[in-house]
Amino acid sequence: MKEFFRLSRKGFTGREDQDSAQIPDDLWVKCSSCRELIYKKQLNDNLKVCPKCGHHMRLSAHEWLGLLDVGSFREMDANLLPTDPLGFVTDEESYAAKLAKTQQRTGMADAVIAGIGAISNMQICVAVADFSFMGASMGSVYGEKMARSAERAAELGVPLLTINTSGGARQQEGVIGLMQMAKVTMALTRLADAGQPHIALLVDPCYGGVTASYPSVADIIIAEPGANIGFAGKRLIEQIMRQKLPAGFQTAEFMLEHGMIDMVVPRSEMRDTLARILRLYRQRSTSPAKAELAGRRATLPQPIM
């Protein structure tokens, strides 16, 4: 769906001579929020946002790559494959078997697609998580791709865009899954040292160790309207605290109101918003004031060792 974010907003038009036998089974989609039926083509033309209530439905990683300029994306680290370091087995199936089934169903090696692309002719590194792959749980490959993306952005001197959704750390990989939180965060310090920004986009749902680590230390944190963002889930918190939580708790709007994120941006405005942010950073990096400051630093006396 390279043209996903550039589709026309035309409504659905049907042929009057179609009989019921020719109507495909997946012609309609029911909105999980307002429960209204929507023509699938109309929904896709509207970037999978319900035209009746504005509910933002989930996108795949490949669909999110439609934010980039057409033909600009080049995938990196596609050869990284998850392993089963613990030989994890439950009564139902092994982790290795579950991985194989998920890979066959999704056509993905793991939950993250990473690479180099451009938005409005401005080069960036990008890493996108896909919730359809084991809930985008963060395992060794997820963390490695995110860390390499940060290091690649630092090496190339370009911004990093991460699009984040997750249910948390991948339990089947134990402490190896948990350590990805620290690994990715440390890689981002090298990006900061290179003077390049990390823009994190949080989409529904984003929970657990992912929320608690690298997206939360981004330079700019953006969320989609209505996205659920948190560490533990709302129901779990209510069970532990034995009291009801405030209305809208853990939604993007709640997080914005309490200063946890910077912006809530509708999907239809996302590409233009990212382009505007990238232009601001580009102007900052090429400003005369910054060049003068860099020159002053270069002439500072070196410390005596």
From Swiss-Prot:
Catalysed conversion reaction: N(6)-carboxybiotinyl-L-lysyl-[protein] + acetyl-CoA = N(6)-biotinyl-L-lysyl-[protein] + malonyl-CoA
Zinc finger extent (C4-type): 31-53
Cofactor: Zn(2+)
InterPro entries listed in its UniProt record: AcCoA_carboxyl_beta, Acetyl_CoA_COase_Trfase_b_su, ClpP/crotonase-like_dom_sf, COA_CT_N, Znf-ACC
Cofactor remark from the record: Binds 1 zinc ion per subunit.
EC number: 2.1.3.15
Annotated GO MF terms: acetyl-CoA carboxylase activity; ATP binding; carboxyl- or carbamoyltransferase activity; zinc ion binding
GO annotation, cellular component aspect: acetyl-CoA carboxylase complex
CoA carboxyltransferase N-terminal domain boundaries: 27-296
SUPFAM superfamilies to which the protein is assigned, alphabetical: ClpP/crotonase (SSF52096)
Alphabetically ordered keywords of this record: ATP-binding, Cytoplasm, Fatty acid biosynthesis, Fatty acid metabolism, Lipid biosynthesis, Lipid metabolism, Metal-binding, Nucleotide-binding, Transferase, Zinc, Zinc-finger
Enzyme class: transferase
Gene Ontology BP terms: malonyl-CoA biosynthetic process; mycolic acid biosynthetic process
Record's subcellular location: Cytoplasm
Gene3D superfamilies linked: 2-enoyl-CoA Hydratase, Chain A, domain 1
Residues noted as binding Zn(2+) in the record, renumbered to the chain: 31, 34, 50, 53
Pathway: Lipid metabolism; malonyl-CoA biosynthesis; malonyl-CoA from acetyl-CoA: step 1/1
Subunit structure: Acetyl-CoA carboxylase is a heterohexamer composed of biotin carboxyl carrier protein (AccB), biotin carboxylase (AccC) and two subunits each of ACCase subunit alpha (AccA) and ACCase subunit beta (AccD).
Record-stated family: Belongs to the AccD/PCCB family.
Function: Component of the acetyl coenzyme A carboxylase (ACC) complex. Biotin carboxylase (BC) catalyzes the carboxylation of biotin on its carrier protein (BCCP) and then the CO(2) group is transferred by the transcarboxylase to acetyl-CoA to form malonyl-CoA.
Full protein name: Acetyl-coenzyme A carboxylase carboxyl transferase subunit beta
Species whose genome carries this gene: Chloroflexus aurantiacus (strain ATCC 29366 / DSM 635 / J-10-fl)
